[in-house]
């Protein structure tokens, strides 16, 4: 088995990923963001969709933990990766909406000492890949934040640009939608957050590098309910003491 995995994962590769953010503000407090992105990665630095090549009894092959969050898999093409508008309402509320917006763009708090765009995909989801799915598409969200406490709610449709309600749209059977609510507290050095995400059946699988083929495909069985608890701490001054991030997640599906 080890020889089979190594035969699929042994090549040296050269890849690139480039992001260009075009940010505009009309009032000094709002943000219109357009992100252009290009790259030539596969899902893993080793290609083969991060697969070991070892068959799974549940179908497919076992994945590695080498899936790359920084990998943009568009074969040298330049694409619009983000397009959304964000503006405040009063001093405590913020609204975000756009045709190309991601779940974490609409959360008041990202529950980790590390960003949502880390190098390895495995460490991207704050310990709860079902709750923090980072769904990308058409969406809108609202958050309230005051004295470190925050409440966020958002909705994202992967197929929001498709006018056929059977295969796309907003809040339709074909939307591939996720709805998320997050409660959080954060200050300059630590924080804690709880999140709930409802994912429709058509949203599909959790990213393969986060678990086994069976676990990642559970979302195909039906609508899923996902919860996540995450916390982090970092020293106020940089040095030898490391930052600590921890997360726990649980998912259930109507089809299991």
What residues fall within each predicted segment?
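Outer membrane beta-barrel
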Residues: 9-161, 183-188
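Detector for outer-membrane/organellar transmembrane beta-barrel domains
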Residues: 148, 174, 186-256
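Long, leucine- and charge-enriched amphipathic alpha-helices
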Residues: 1-8
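Charged, low-complexity surface patches
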Residues: 74, 131, 172-173, 220
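Solvent-exposed loop segments that connect transmembrane elements
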Residues: 46-65, 162-172, 203-220, 252-256
